[in-house]
């Protein structure tokens, strides 16, 4: 396993891209951006006791894993001609779980960009500056905040997210050269039924993006969010949204080298890796956190090689990667 700096030395910045997983956000604050914390803060309403007991039954805090098992149970019961009322309840509970995930992520998210220090933003901006195109699977705003901090070094780091005034996605305009892609949506993105919009800080009203999202949730208006439990269902949702579908298709257009940071290579995101495998990317650099011989990391390494085969895959140390702080 090599270090991050060595991986940079082996690649050319002009053809180097990155896919960010949850490890990017966890490297800023592990407590806020992990499933255990979200589970402890989640409230599933009148179904709270039942749904939480399912997490406990499977000994996991992973929302997507539980959703997958619930839907699989409903499918099995349906095949055995089980009680239709019970099957419908399981599927309803799955929707409650999905909506609760969006709610708890929003509730636990830092309200203001000032929660992140200027020093941390500068480190993150230097990290992101190393890549031509940035793809993320994260819903939170940390990367979005970092790229928008234009008054902080490096000043040359400027990216195009495809949105133009009035905060509308406009990727097909001639003056748009999108470089930032939220593959599974994000808290600040929403579909108003006509176009894809994004929340921006309202200076006049002094209303933060997170506050705007919370106000929308109170009115049952949800952000653009892909949290389906399987890669098949995620693909279905992506194909039915113009922004998500466009971002997804850009993966196949890539060439050069692709870094993948902070992802455990779960089966539920295989649609992403299938698209990357069919791209013209020469080599993948995949981060590994902790002991590379641990059971978890051995599974990650095996999945990365399997999902991206026959491409060349190189592994680098996540701890050697300076994102928010000096490594």
Language model feature labels by segment:
Residues 53-91, 120-121, 125-235:
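Extended, H/D-rich, highly charged conserved domains that either
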Residues 1-132, 137-140:
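Gly/serine-rich nucleotide phosphate-binding loop at the start of the catalytic core
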Residues 31-32, 195, 273:
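Short coil/turn segments at secondary-structure boundaries
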Residues 47-53, 164-181, 282-301:
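Short, flexible loop segments at boundaries between secondary-structure elements
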Residues 31-39, 148-154, 302:
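Short secondary-structure boundary/capping segments
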Residues 1-18, 24-28, 234, 245-327:
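SIR2/sirtuin-family catalytic core signature
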Residues 22-23, 139, 185-186, 263-264:
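Active-site metal-binding loops of divalent metal-dependent hydrolases
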Residues 1-5, 114-119, 162-169, 236-249:
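A Trp-anchored, charged/polar loop motif used as the substrate-binding/catalytic surface
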